[in-house]
Amino acid sequence: RDSSTSRGLGDVYKRQFIGGSILATFTQGMTVGAVINGFSVTGRAYSGGPFDWLTVFNLFCGAGLVVAYALLGSTWLVMKSENALQQRMRRVSRTLLILLLVFIAAISLWTPLAQPAIAARWFTLPNLFFLLPVPALVVILSLCQWRCLKNPESHHLPFILTLGLIFLGFSGLGISIWPHIIPPSITLWQAAAPTQSQGFMLVGALLIIPVILVYTFWSYYVFRGKVQHGEGYH
């Protein structure tokens, strides 16, 4: 097989990998939007239509999550790369940060306007005082992120701050719908599996989770540090 054929197959694989990653992330974001909107449930069974998920809000949430994960990827490359690639990723990350803040602001305003229960959760007293740190931290982390991306000596903080922004975003989701797991009517406890099933799963989790953690820490240790030019899989 000649090198041109190998390069062609490599390009096809890259496009498929990119497309599949974007589609999976977009679908996950649409799922988040559908959870915020709530589901039609009658007698503990879904009673909505087959295309209830296809709304402008859900599509918007899907696009927002694509931007969030793209920022995770670009700041990861800031941390792992150097020279020209790192500088390019810093510029890309600044653009993605602005886009992410636009999506966060739009969804944060859109959600309470469309869902009175969520508006009451966030904007009534004394809840407002207790929940105000969430948007305040988003602003603080974003300002720190911008400064770090402009600082050529900052390598790890942009990625860590992006993790913080995404954590705050999902924390806001949890605050908005708690204690419901299937809004607007089924709570976490109502949707829970029987106690015996949970106990069985707990035993398996206690055995598997330590193995996963050890493997994850070891893989990060092996691939620690910067990736030099020419290194990687071919």
Predicted regions located by residue number:
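Mid-bilayer segments of alpha-helical transmembrane spans in multi-pass integral membrane proteins
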Residues: 1, 18-35
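Transmembrane helix-loop-helix
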Residues: 1, 95-98, 102-164
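Single conserved hydrophobic/aromatic residue that forms the stacking wall/gate
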Residues: 2-13
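Membrane-helix interface motif
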Residues: 30-45, 109-118, 175-185
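Loop-centered beta-sheet repeat module
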Residues: 43-96
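Hydrophobic alpha-helical transmembrane segments
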Residues: 54-68, 132-135, 199-212
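Short, membrane-exposed interhelical loops at transmembrane-helix boundaries
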Residues: 182-201
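Short, highly charged, low-complexity non-transmembrane loops/tails of multi-pass membrane proteins
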Residues: 225-234
